[in-house]
Amino acid sequence: MTLQQQIIKALGAKPQINAEEEIRRSVDFLKSYLQTYPFIKSLVLGISGGQDSTLAGKLCQMAINELRQETRNESLQFIAVRLPYGVQADEQDCQDAIAFIQPDRVLTVNIKGAVLASEQALREAGIELSDFVRGNEKARERMKAQYSIAGMTSGVVVGTDHAAEAITGFFTKYGDGGTDINPLYRLNKRQGKQLLTALGCPEHLYKKAPTADLEDDRPSLPDEVALGVTYDNIDDYLEGKNLPEQVARTIENWYLKTEHKRRPPINVFDDFWKK
């Protein structure tokens, strides 16, 4: 088995999908989890205005709507959380995503004060954060807020990780990578677009250039610039297609060097890091 085949198998990626079937699969997956653990009353998700959180949010609200109707349990809710750092440049996209999702509840937590306070505390201890590390601080502060909300609403935190993100490890460890349940896992980027198209999502929410937008020095830096490959390249790779050698090597290098992000903390029984 080639490395490409191993990666595709590990991430559960498929070369083709039926959008309606995958929507149903994700919604049923969320419903089944909630029914298995009846003490869970809410799904909590940060909404950025980008493709992934818009899709995950819509699926969450669909699952909650169906489950409320089927069980008559009115205590179930989906909580969409806005998590700007100061003023978000694409705030209108966030509002458009909220309008599309129609969440039960919307909360806004501005993380800037918490990030600056943490940075100042570290500075006083003699640690000056780089812009890159400050970006990770933002991602972790966002997850901290979501877990606090989930803790107070008997909820779980929903993630937006999918195959095209997992393959490169393009998420912050214990930040946006630290969630309870991932309904998009297995899909690549273009497949996520297929689901949003089937759901009637406004095109500008999934046709915009994806960006983590964590670095102050490089605001709205496109993911594809940071990665050195395009999402079309990544999707083609995950669909088993042949790519130019350098492109395939870049993707595989990202996968191998970020393996630790896709695993629990390393213990004495692990040996993947020696290979």
Swiss-Prot record:
Record field: catalytic activity: deamido-NAD(+) + NH4(+) + ATP = AMP + diphosphate + NAD(+) + H(+)
Biological process according to GO: NAD biosynthetic process
Keyword Phosphoprotein: no
GO cellular component: cytoplasm
Top enzyme category: ligase
Binding site for Mg(2+): 52, 165
Protein name: NH(3)-dependent NAD(+) synthetase
Keywords: ATP-binding, Ligase, Magnesium, Metal-binding, NAD, Nucleotide-binding
Domain of life: Bacteria
GO molecular function terms listed in the Swiss-Prot or TrEMBL record: ATP binding; glutaminase activity; metal ion binding; NAD+ synthase (glutamine-hydrolyzing) activity; NAD+ synthase activity
Recorded family membership: Belongs to the NAD synthetase family.
Assembly description: Homodimer.
Binding site for ATP: 46-53, 160, 189, 211
Organism annotation: Shigella flexneri
Gene3D superfamilies in alphabetical order: HUPs (3.40.50.620)
UniProt binding sites for deamido-NAD(+): 140, 173, 180, 260-261
High-level lineage: Bacteria, Pseudomonadati, Pseudomonadota, Gammaproteobacteria, Enterobacterales
Enzyme nomenclature, EC number: 6.3.1.5
Pathway info: Cofactor biosynthesis; NAD(+) biosynthesis; NAD(+) from deamido-NAD(+) (ammonia route): step 1/1
Role according to the record: Catalyzes the ATP-dependent amidation of deamido-NAD to form NAD. Uses ammonia as a nitrogen source.
Any single Pfam family the record assigns to this protein: NAD_synthase
SUPFAM superfamilies: Adenine nucleotide alpha hydrolases-like
